[in-house]
């Protein structure tokens, strides 16, 4: 069975090797004119400076948490326990590495995309450069995630003999190691998403509010001092943040599936049901194998699009990459399921929760794959200007900004229903065919081809940057037309990616919650989270409000940083003679510093709350309160994230619909366009800061709670004072 780990490490190394190959391939391309090189260098320096400062803050937080873990688990196990802390550090390193590499390639690829468009005037060739750059981020997400899991298995599972059946029945250290590895990934994801989101939207709003709305100059105009900061933000928020986010979801889903397999086994043993050590081993390896197959499928899907002849339809090419990866994953997953579980004793399969025989976990995982594609399609319908919802926002803009906002709110709210129906069906059917393990496998299935989806999502900000460089370098209009078309498709893929991220986060959080319940309840007992229990109900009420508090803090953080940016841009327009005539250069460096300082200052409190809140709640009120807290927060956050992501995406593409000339007499600079710009500006922090951060909030809360579940049960204030557990 251990030989299956060879498939995992081979898939990880193939992905990282192909990522390195594409990284080198992109860097070999020419950067273009001296002006293009100058702008690209400024973006690169700004992005490097921000992520360096951010990682220094993360390092301090990580050291504190690692020391705390060592102390907590030493108390819990009665002997010095360093293993969970080391696994936590491995998770931090893997997630930080993926984010750093992704940000690096984005700052190299952007100018090369612009130059390819300038030289070829061909959208197909330009798309390939952007996708090749995006694939580096996508492949690193899958590669580093599986590499870290492989290290945890090899070092702790086999090296320290934690996978021994007696060890699993005893202290459960291996499952704690997996939880801590997932938490390490979560910490980096939270800081990258929150910090990057505040940075990018503060710069974006500052550039738009003064540049477009007041000075009436085009987007990415070189006269606007906030333009460089805006382009830096695309890299630190939409590339590094996105990659860390989905890497964390990927790891969380796999880890929770493995932990659930162990919990189900121990529960069956406690109930004297017929169980098999070999069956446990197969269930512990199956999530890893399925994820490895998905990673290989993603490599094939990306390679096919990069190697085939380019077309003038970028949306179709990107869909081919994603759908082919999904299809190969389903087929390969069936083969793996057949080889692992076919021939297993029917009674043992039934005890494990496999209600439709050996094929049960494959059905659950495949359902996750399909539901991910469907949720992405729903997001596309509500955010692409090819469809009615976004077109109605553009039409409403003819009557002013108030109706733009109102119509966008309507679209965002209505867009919540169908993804939740899909998630509800997926959750129930997965449970029906394969029990709690099936829900975890649905999350693994949805994320199995994550490298393909992240590659497509990262292509968007790279194309957006390329358009900015083309505009600031004053390249011919045909170049901007190509980059604008790629950017428009990128906005839709970004909305699809956000829907995919929150969908996968909800399934991952649900399986982590189940693992949390197993962690502190007596082995063999039925899982019980009864809402007639006032502790659970109180926790759910508080949890339902928490995403709104968190979102409000993020929006306020963006507003505070954007206000400083607006003041600086206005000052430069007022005090630097000739800047609006193009005779003087703006001071872009000051704007970059404002965004960096604002993001680094404002990100701390939301990030800390997401980690500390469940800990304080657990030690005050115990694990049942925390269980309610997690359910309330998850349900609330899912709906809020879908609403903010789709409303913001629809406002953005509604503006682009007007810019495309689709509404007669209402192009750039028209009253309808001015109203649409207001909608786009309002939607920016919603879709790029709030929405993406909410899915990390529910995952990090679930992971922190899982790690500390036993401590909550044994050492909470209610128990110490009143004896209530």
Task: List each model region and its residues.
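Hydrophobic packing and interface segments
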Residues: 1-725
């Amino acid at each position: 069975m251990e030989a299956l780990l060879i498939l995992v490490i081979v898939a990880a190394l193939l992905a990282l090797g192909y990522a390195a190959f594409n990284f080198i391939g992109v860097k070999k391309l020419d950067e273009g004119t001296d002006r293009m090189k100058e702008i690209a260098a400024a973006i690169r320096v700004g992005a490097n400076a921000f992520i360096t400062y951010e990682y220094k803050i993360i390092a301090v937080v990580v050291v504190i948490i690692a020391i705390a873990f060592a102390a907590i688990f030493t108390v819990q196990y009665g002997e010095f326990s360093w293993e969970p802390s080391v696994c936590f550090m491995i998770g931090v390193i893997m997630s930080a590495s993926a984010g750093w590499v992704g940000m690096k390639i984005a700052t190299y690829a952007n100018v090369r995309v612009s130059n390819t468009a300038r030289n070829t005037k061909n959208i197909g060739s330009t798309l390939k450069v952007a996708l090749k750059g995006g694939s580096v981020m996508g492949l690193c997400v899958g590669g580093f995630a599986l590499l870290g899991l492989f290290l945890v298995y090899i070092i702790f599972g086999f090296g320290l003999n934690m996978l021994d059946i007696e060890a699993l029945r005893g202290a459960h250290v291996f499952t704690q190691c997996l939880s801590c590895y997932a938490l390490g990934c979560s910490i980096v994801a939270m800081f990258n998403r929150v910090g990057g989101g505040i940075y990018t939207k503060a710069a974006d709003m500052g550039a738009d509010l003064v540049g477009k709305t007041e000075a009436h100059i085009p987007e990415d105009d070189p006269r606007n001092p906030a333009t460089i900061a805006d382009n830096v933000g695309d890299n630190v928020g939409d590339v590094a943040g996105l990659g860390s986010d989905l890497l964390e979801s990927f790891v969380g889903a796999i880890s929770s599936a493995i932990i659930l397999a162990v919990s189900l086994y121990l529960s069956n043993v406690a109930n004297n049901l017929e169980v098999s050590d070999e069956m446990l081993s197969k269930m512990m390896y199956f999530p890893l194998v399925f994820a490895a197959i998905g990673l290989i499928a993603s490599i094939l899907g990306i390679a096919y699009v990069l190697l085939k002849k380019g077309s003038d339809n970028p949306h179709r090419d990107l869909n081919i990459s994603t759908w082919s990866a999904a299809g190969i994953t389903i087929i390969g997953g069936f083969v793996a399921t057949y080889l692992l579980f076919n021939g297993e004793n029917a009674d043992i399969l039934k005890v494990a929760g496999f209600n439709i025989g050996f094929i049960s976990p494959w059905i659950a995982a495949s359902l996750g794959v399909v539901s991910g594609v469907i949720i992405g399609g729903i997001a596309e319908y509500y955010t692409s200007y090819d469809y009615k919802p976004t077109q109605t926002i553009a039409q409403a803009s003819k009557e002013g900004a108030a109706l733009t906002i109102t119509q966008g709110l309507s679209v965002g709210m209505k867009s919540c229903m169908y993804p939740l129906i899909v998630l509800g069906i997926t959750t129930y059917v997965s449970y029906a065919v394969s029990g709690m393990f099936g829900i975890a496998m649905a999350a693994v299935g949805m994320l199995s081809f994550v490298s393909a989806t992240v590659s497509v999502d990262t292509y968007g900000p790279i194309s957006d940057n390329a358009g900015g460089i083309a505009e600031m370098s004053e390249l011919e209009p045909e170049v901007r037309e190509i980059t604008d078309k790629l950017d428009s498709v990128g906005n839709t893929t970004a909305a699809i990616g956000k829907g995919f991220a929150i969908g996968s986060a909800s399934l991952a959080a649900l399986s982590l919650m189940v693992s949390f319940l197993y962690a502190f309840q007596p082995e063999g007992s039925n899982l019980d989270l009864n809402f007639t229990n006032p502790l659970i109900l109180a926790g759910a009420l508080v949890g339902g409000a928490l995403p709104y508090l968190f979102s409000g803090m993020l929006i306020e953080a963006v507003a505070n940083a954007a206000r400083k940016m607006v003041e600086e841009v206005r000052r430069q327009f007022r005090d630097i003679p000739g800047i609006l005539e193009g005779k003087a250069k703006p001071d872009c460096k000051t704007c970059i510093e404002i965004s960096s300082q604002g993001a680094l200052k404002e990100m701390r409190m939301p990030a800390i709350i997401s980690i500390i809140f469940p800990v304080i709640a657990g030690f005050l009120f115990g694990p049942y309160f925390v269980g309610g807290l997690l359910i309330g927060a998850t349900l609330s956050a899912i709906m809020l994230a879908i609403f903010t992501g789709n409303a913001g995406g629809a406002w953005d593409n509604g503006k682009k619909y007007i810019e495309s000339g689709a509404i007669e007499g209402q192009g750039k600079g028209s009253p309808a366009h001015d109203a649409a710009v207001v909608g786009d500006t309002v939607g920016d922090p919603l879709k790029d800061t709030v929405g993406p951060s909410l899915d990390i909030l529910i995952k990090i809360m679930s992971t922190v709670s899982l790690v500390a579940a036993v401590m909550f049960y044994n050492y909470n204030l209610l128990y110490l004072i009143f004896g209530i557990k």
